[in-house]
């Protein structure tokens, strides 16, 4: 087993501002520019596949596949994974063709395809669950966030969708571009890069944040906050991040795309059975957080976090790796996004047919084949390709 990490020169920490995705300056990613990118891919079919990721445990499958040599085993040339600091910088690089495969917030994937008309496809779920609402030590209930600001990683994120469901369930109103009011029972939403959230909580700038791990585990380890609710306890086994590939990769390098998916699915199967070992790999040059914090995030138990769970049988505390992309989730997510407040272009949601979105945006061909190669759906604790969504704020 290899323990290679990306070289220092490949770590791109771009963009220090908010994680809001506005779509400005993204013309290079529109479908009419696809021919230029296609020509580039066709001219250099052996160019290494370039991977982009954020320093969060959500990226585990992409990174485990690299560390364990699974891409090599699948005969797929890959460059060292490139670390980005914010979702906006990662998304912009992907749309502009600077990286070929990434993990991405699923609502952002919808915006990328329908808002920006980018030539991209969801090819698998990258993971399920893995996020939480973390608050200051003095915050006991969601209602206590009245008059506070809460950080979100991006407007188009499952985090924002689920947070707003929690706020409304507690009788609070999310607001943007205005100061929150305790008497008015409002909460200000503040887009922020995940790496900035813990310092902001510690300095009293925000009352809480909703984000992927290991930033929730880090807050508890440093005793500056506590996990109030795991998002997987609100929306059971939801897809936070999906695996996305550029259309150029799928069209002009189908063997590389298929091999890449084989490696990714193999990594998911390995990671869900080897959590401490996964933490060790991630801490060896891929993520900046220390191994104990990463391992804590990968090994949460319902017994230790009972106060953050209302449905312990859902195991919403558990970051899991289940690659099959369920149509029911896509459809419910589209409907939820249409009810979510954002300070970003939202016209692309008007008139979207949830079922059609899944057929147009998600291509499960490769992942279905790859799942069979590692033992089928049962290898991931799954029993079928349909399910019913369960949401309880």
PLM features: residue spans?
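Short, glycine-/small- and polar/acidic-enriched structural segments
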Residues: 22-25, 29-191, 202-203, 207-213, ...
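Pocket-lining segment of extracytoplasmic ligand-binding domains
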Residues: 106-108, 183, 195-293
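Short Gly/Pro-enriched turn/cap motifs at secondary-structure boundaries
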Residues: 53, 124, 232-234, 302-303, ...
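Short, cationic motifs built from Arg/Lys/His that form the positively charged side of catalytic pockets
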Residues: 8-9, 164
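N-terminal export signals
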Residues: 4, 10-32
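Predominant activation on well-ordered alpha-helical scaffold segments within soluble catalytic domains
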Residues: 110, 164, 168, 217, ...
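Conserved C-terminal helix/tail region of periplasmic/extracytoplasmic solute-binding proteins
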Residues: 331-393
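Secondary-structure end/capping motifs
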Residues: 253-347
